[in-house]
Amino acid sequence: MARGDAGRGRGLLALTFCLLAARGELLLPQETTVELSCGVGPLQVILGPEQAAVLNCSLGAAAAGPPTRVTWSKDGDTLLEHDHLHLLPNGSLWLSQPLAPNGSDESVPEAVGVIEGNYSCLAHGPLGVLASQTAVVKLATLADFSLHPESQTVEENGTARFECHIEGLPAPIITWEKDQVTLPEEPRLIVLPNGVLQILDVQESDAGPYRCVATNSARQHFSQEALLSVAHRGSLASTRGQDVVIVAAPENTTVVSGQSVVMECVASADPTPFVSWVRQDGKPISTDVIVLGRTNLLIANAQPWHSGVYVCRANKPRTRDFATAAAELRVLAAPAITQAPEALSRTRASTARFVCRASGEPRPALRWLHNGAPLRPNGRVKVQGGGGSLVITQIGLQDAGYYQCVAENSAGMACAAASLAVVVREGLPSAPTRVTATPLSSSAVLVAWERPEMHSEQIIGFSLHYQKARGMDNVEYQFAVNNDTTELQVRDLEPNTDYEFYVVAYSQLGASRTSTPALVHTLDDVPSAAPQLSLSSPNPSDIRVAWLPLPPSLSNGQVVKYKIEYGLGKEDQIFSTEVRGNETQLMLNSLQPNKVYRVRISAGTAAGFGAPSQWMHHRTPSMHNQSHVPFAPAELKVQAKMESLVVSWQPPPHPTQISGYKLYWREVGAEEEANGDRLPGGRGDQAWDVGPVRLKKKVKQYELTQLVPGRLYEVKLVAFNKHEDGYAAVWKGKTEKAPAPDMPIQRGPPLPPAHVHAESNSSTSIWLRWKKPDFTTVKIVNYTVRFSPWGLRNASLVTYYTSSGEDILIGGLKPFTKYEFAVQSHGVDMDGPFGSVVERSTLPDRPSTPPSDLRLSPLTPSTVRLHWCPPTEPNGEIVEYLILYSSNHTQPEHQWTLLTTQGNIFSAEVHGLESDTRYFFKMGARTEVGPGPFSRLQDVITLQEKLSDSLDMHSVTGIIVGVCLGLLCLLACMCAGLRRSPHRESLPGLSSTATPGNPALYSRARLGPPSPPAAHELESLVHPHPQDWSPPPSDVEDRAEVHSLMGGGVSEGRSHSKRKISWAQPSGLSWAGSWAGCELPQAGPRPALTRALLPPAGTGQTLLLQALVYDAIKGNGRKKSPPACRNQVEAEVIVHSDFSASNGNPDLHLQDLEPEDPLPPEAPDLISGVGDPGQGAAWLDRELGGCELAAPGPDRLTCLPEAASASCSYPDLQPGEVLEETPGDSCQLKSPCPLGASPGLPRSPVSSSA
């Protein structure tokens, strides 16, 4: 079974089966499979005798998976199974043509109605339902010949032509036989597909009987035989000197693209004419068109560009005689989907837009299916742009499923499908409850509701939606309502109309379900117009008043009564009477003859009477000469249309006395309409614009045409006889108003809205407001808002909202993300362009995710290094990172140690940990709104201490002795220095806080008196000299190298720069007093981390010990001491600064002088002080060059900027970007990694040392 491809509108399916018998048993008919999908169609399936087919519902590819259930329909109705048509277990449909009881090829008559028809299937899946294309199943047939070949006589070298015609399914193959033998294939014998046989250059051997043979899968038929006689050339008088005659002219032909077509042209003349082809439009004939035989055109693969009028021209040689024949070729193109709709995923209450474009000839019509059923437009679902655009607003769960665009024309159909997934987030509020609508008047309704039961505290606003509850293509209107409002008065409604209201709640996460709709019927209003009257008098003392009921568009409710007012002429006395609302006429009795009365009517509803009609004047007949004057026609009624009035009536009393009717009408002027003072005569004695129109007595209806819409007209009808005209029946009323044009005719679409302004409402919502276009001639009915994340080019993520107002609250957005908005105006059946783009970012929020790619690595027995990248969803500018760690992960979180660092830091070192201990770490990030979640726990085990890290007993004893001696020397030096320089200018004091330029400096310090001579602890970490202080030349020359108390960054190779200190004089002066209060210049800003733990009190002792040991090694004297500071500071300071930019301030870091590894054999004896001082200095310089940056001992955190700790560069980041971890210990730009600084979380207090 073959199915039609995209180039064919209909695929012919020819099934050829054989009846096989074995051992006397009849085998089942052979089965052929046909695949039904959402594609080009319809498919044509033709079943021959004893043939079967299996129809598969192959919609799995479009449905993204096999269907869970398949249902079939035939001719639009549910399929009923029977012996020759039943469902297979896999959902396929099996059908076959029954066997003829007599074994003939004839179809069983009962099977025709049972098997033949249009079949389609529905595939039910988890996401929805898909409908297949249609398969047209027919039984193979072959009718009798409708045209048999005819005998003919042809001269030698002439052209013979036989033709036969027969109908069949599938189209029969035509062959020809001569003497009941199939004709051989010769260039002279041309068999055309339409059943024509042309014999060129006829010879005597061609004479004989010919017949046509038609064959298809149903049977084979033979035509009647036709005899061909061959005459000698010139023997036929009819052909001698014959003018040009076209024997077989081309015929108008319509084919489907891809089929073949032959345009035949056979001409006769003496001598044989020349035949040529041209196109009537002057275009050249396509090069793929070939000549079949000598005079026929063959288009093997017809395409739309082949369409046109082809002209066959036959010219008689050596003369100017010619004959022409023309025929039109029309090539149809089956529909092809040029732009298929795309699958969409939308949150609840948002807008989805499907776009479908199709081509074909003729232009295909588009229609939409939802879950296999025809889509019915309503207030939320609209089909725009000639069916090519489907817009669904206020999406709900009921809108999820598959949407199919079906393009159809006379050549076939095409289909494309797309799914709509409705995303419902967790934590959304439930639907508002107890929605009520109370009518306040004919045009106002009070809608009230209660807040949702779930997550009510998260609501940021509501939207109220309403539309007419009856009718099709109703427009849905909506209003945005504040969070604190639970009722709204809706105005400008239509009276006596049913409306449907529902409410949706919004939180920062999105929209709730729609509430249960509330139905309300607006109250009646007074009618907006009065019925149109007709007056007539059946006798001199009565006036019959008749009217037509008001249409619903004018009644504004149910008309329950009419009031008729009347009086004499211009007299002030007016009489009135009321009748029920179901009455349409009233007889006014006891009137005076031959008097002018004025009459008017008003209609009333439960709300009261509307405006009355214009006064209508009527003269009653006279009491004299009544035997000859006809009365007025009865029951005059006029149906007002926009440009015409249909006048109908009944004959007056005694109709035999009348000869006919005269009809007059005129347009009432504006001044007369306002005054209403024209008094008609009794028998048509006034001038009228048109008339009289004489009508026969049998006529009872006449239409007045070419009137102006919305104008007031007066109609008069009188009956006449051979004596005179009778009394008039008069009607006065207005023609219907022309429908208000959408706007005056304009060439362009409506302009986009003006003054579009976006304002951030929360982290997930933005208010968008605009105003109507400043200059437009188009009536704006609603607007479409298009928005997407800034810079996005993925069309599937662009969202559309429809708003009837001039503002809309757009929710469900991502925090701290820039969006771009554009607004489009819509007229009636006309869409304008989108306006300029407006950008706005949502407000920040807490981070949704913790810092990513947290890595821990132990550096020393007491130090662990952390490295991380920013959160993948920071939802704002990260102002600081939070580090929690503990050796017991079961402790409550508030008992863990909290460390913080600024938002532009991505690595840190934690010091003061215990060796060979398992620590648990987790990190969080914080924006200005608050902290986000912490990462999952990660653990690390610190390194184990080596034996060489501790000193032996002899070393400790030597150190203690050295410390005591050094303290004494230090005290003596300090005293001597103070005596010599009592008024020395002091250096700037050490600041107890980080300088603004160096946020990485954190200190715990207090001002105090100079250290006493017995001090055994140095509690300050000193700075280098200020930039404006210059040491004496001797100091520059005698500067020695020492282990530094300041540290810098560490490169990836963990190499360290040399640590150097300008050492104080070794003579009696103490360097401690001179440097204790000196403030070090800051080399550059360094990010800071704070700690809650204080370093042990032994820090100063360790530093002093290091200095004394080094002094013992160096052993060279000092000539001068550096300037002493007047104010001395006692402090414990942790400094982490980068001095790499200054050659005068080497990169320093707090370190112990004790090497981790045992001293090499060539190392000088530090305890005894024996050894060459130069050798000791060189050795120490080498050793200090390889030390770690972080010193064991004090429990502290050293924060390393990424530039120093790893090759991880973080440029200035913008919202919408994040950092992605890449190999090489670096993070590259991926999503927001904003640099910010203003820590706001509580930190552990920093205590000053006592």
UniProtKB/Swiss-Prot annotation:
SUPFAM superfamilies (alphabetical): Fibronectin type III (SSF49265), Immunoglobulin (SSF48726)
Q: Where are the transmembrane segments?
A: 958-978
Q: Can you list the GO cellular component terms from the UniProt entry?
A: plasma membrane
Q: State the InterPro entries in the record.
A: FN3_dom, FN3_sf, Ig-like_dom, Ig-like_dom_sf, Ig-like_fold, Ig_I-set, Ig_sub, Ig_sub2
Gene Ontology BP terms? cell-cell adhesion
Q: How does it sit in the membrane?
A: Single-pass type I membrane protein
Q: Which residues form the Fibronectin type-III domain?
A: 431-525, 527-623, 632-741, 752-845, 850-945
Q: Provide the positions where the record notes the PTM Phosphothreonine.
A: 995
Major location category of this protein: membrane
Which cysteines pair up through disulfides? They are: 57-121, 164-212, 265-312, 356-405
**Record flagged with keyword Membrane:** yes
Q: Where is the signal peptide?
A: 1-24
Q: Does the keyword Disulfide bond apply?
A: yes
Q: Which residues are glycosylated?
A: 90, 102, 157, 252, 582
Q: Which residues lie on this side of the membrane: Cytoplasmic?
A: 979-1250
Keywords assigned: Cell membrane, Disulfide bond, Glycoprotein, Immunoglobulin domain, Membrane, Phosphoprotein, Repeat, Signal, Transmembrane, Transmembrane helix
Residues annotated as region Disordered?
1140-1175, 1215-1250
Query: Which subcellular locations apply to this protein?
Result: Cell membrane
- Which ranges make up the Extracellular topological domains here? 25-957
Q: What does the similarity note say?
A: Belongs to the immunoglobulin superfamily. DCC family.
The protein, known as: Immunoglobulin superfamily DCC subclass member 4
Q: Which organism is it from?
A: Homo sapiens (Human)
